[in-house]
């Protein structure tokens, strides 16, 4: 009987320890940016960022995985996110996203390019 009680107590204590050591939620800029990207950018840029969202846009949305976008500086991409891109459907996000969210989206876009 004592062995069963000891085993039971060890299981309860072990379960409590396991719950405390669970990994915290991913709160990196790229993880936060992914959430914003999924909410705001996927309709046009597509789930993988390849510009395959709305097929009827002319010109089509940028393929964020393309070599041309990979070679742009962070400053260039931040300007595009903040202010949009002339003569395209890419509008300004500066009044919708906070500055932190814009940087987070940029961090996520950079992960699409690897």
Language-model regions: role of each:
Residues 18-19, 44-50, 82-83, 110:
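Detector for the c-type heme attachment site
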Residues 1-5:
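Positively charged n-region of N-terminal signal peptides that target proteins for export
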Residues 6-15:
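Bacterial N-terminal signal peptides
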Residues 33-47, 105-109:
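The canonical Cys-X-X-Cys-His
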Residues 53-55:
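Short, surface-exposed glycine/acidic/tryptophan-bearing loops
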Residues 17-36:
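Electrostatic cytochrome c docking/interface patches
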Residues 58-111:
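Extracytoplasmic electron-transfer domains, predominantly the class I c-type cytochrome c fold
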């Amino acid at each position: 009987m004592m062995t069963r009680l000891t085993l039971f107590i060890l299981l309860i204590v072990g379960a409590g320890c396991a719950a405390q050591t669970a990994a915290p939620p991913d709160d990196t800029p790229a993880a936060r940016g992914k959430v914003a990207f999924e909410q705001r950018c996927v309709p046009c840029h597509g789930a993988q960022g390849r510009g395959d969202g709305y097929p009827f846009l002319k010109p089509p949305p940028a393929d964020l995985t393309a070599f041309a976008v990979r070679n742009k500086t962070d400053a260039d991409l931040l300007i595009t996110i903040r202010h949009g891109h002339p003569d395209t459907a890419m509008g300004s996000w500066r009044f919708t996203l906070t500055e932190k969210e814009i940087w987070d989206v940029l961090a996520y876009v950079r992960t699409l390019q690897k």
